[in-house]
């Protein structure tokens, strides 16, 4: 089993770590009955409204930028009315963050590090108040 995991590309292992942690800690996960995050619901509504033909800042209003709404609108296309698409965006963002952190740690250490060194910082971030 260990040999099989070590053959997977590093990004795939980081994505798997991100998916497991976010499935447990993010309210966008199907493991939660509903997502009560006010901002996420606003962004999701704005994005779906924008893709539904409404004009931002005239028909619907919030003070964030249109790129954020576009991302959430695309997530709405992937997941319908639930937050599966948003969870996919979160997994992509966390994987990018972990990969960048791992590469930075490798540059500072001067050697190649195991992907699993990122498990503790990833778990700490996913369990923080940012995901509550």
Please state what every model-predicted region is.
Residues 16-17, 70, 88, 115-119:
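Hydrophobic alpha-helical transmembrane segments
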Residues 31-46, 59-74, 81-84:
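Extracytoplasmic catalytic/substrate-binding loops of multi-pass membrane glycan-assembly enzymes
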């Amino acid at each position: 089993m260990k040999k099989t995991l070590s053959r997977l590309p590093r990004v795939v292992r980081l994505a798997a770590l991100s998916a497991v942690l976010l499935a447990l800690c993010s309210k966008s996960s199907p493991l939660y009955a509903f997502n009560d995050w006010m901002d996420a619901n606003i962004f999701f509504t704005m994005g779906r409204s924008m893709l539904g033909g409404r004009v931002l800042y005239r028909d619907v209003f919030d003070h964030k930028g249109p790129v954020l709404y576009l991302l959430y609108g695309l997530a709405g296309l992937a997941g319908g009315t639930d937050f599966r698409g948003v969870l996919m965006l979160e997994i992509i963002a966390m994987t990018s963050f972990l990969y960048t952190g791992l590469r930075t740690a490798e540059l500072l250490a001067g050697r190649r590090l195991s992907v699993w060194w990122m498990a503790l910082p990833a778990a700490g971030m996913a369990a923080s108040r940012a995901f509550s």
